[in-house]
């Protein structure tokens, strides 16, 4: 899963990609091609 600042280009990678809001975060999910998954701006673990 990629961590991106903006999901605008991520949702246009594949026609099946869709944006979902879960627990206050925005995710891009793609059931037909799971390598296109992305999340918007998550805090990095240290």
Swiss-Prot record:
Xref: SUPFAM superfamilies: Ribosomal protein L36
Induction: Expressed during stationary phase in minimal glucose medium, induced by EDTA, strongly repressed on shifting from minimal glucose to minimal glycerol medium (at protein level). Induced under zinc-limiting conditions in stationary phase; repressed by the zinc uptake regulatory protein Zur.
Ribosomal protein recorded as keyword: yes
Single GO molecular function: structural constituent of ribosome
Pfam families per UniProt: Ribosomal_L36 (PF00444)
Keyword terms, alphabetized: Ribonucleoprotein, Ribosomal protein, Stress response
PROSITE patterns according to UniProt: RIBOSOMAL_L36 (PS00828)
Gene Ontology terms: biological process: translation
Protein name: Large ribosomal subunit protein bL36B
Protein source organism: Escherichia coli (strain K12)
């Amino acid at each position: 899963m990629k961590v991106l600042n903006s999901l605008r280009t991520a949702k246009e990678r594949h026609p099946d990609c869709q944006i979902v809001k879960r627990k206050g975060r925005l995710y891009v999910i793609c059931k037909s091609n799971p390598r296109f998954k992305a999340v918007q701006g998550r805090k990095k673990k240290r």
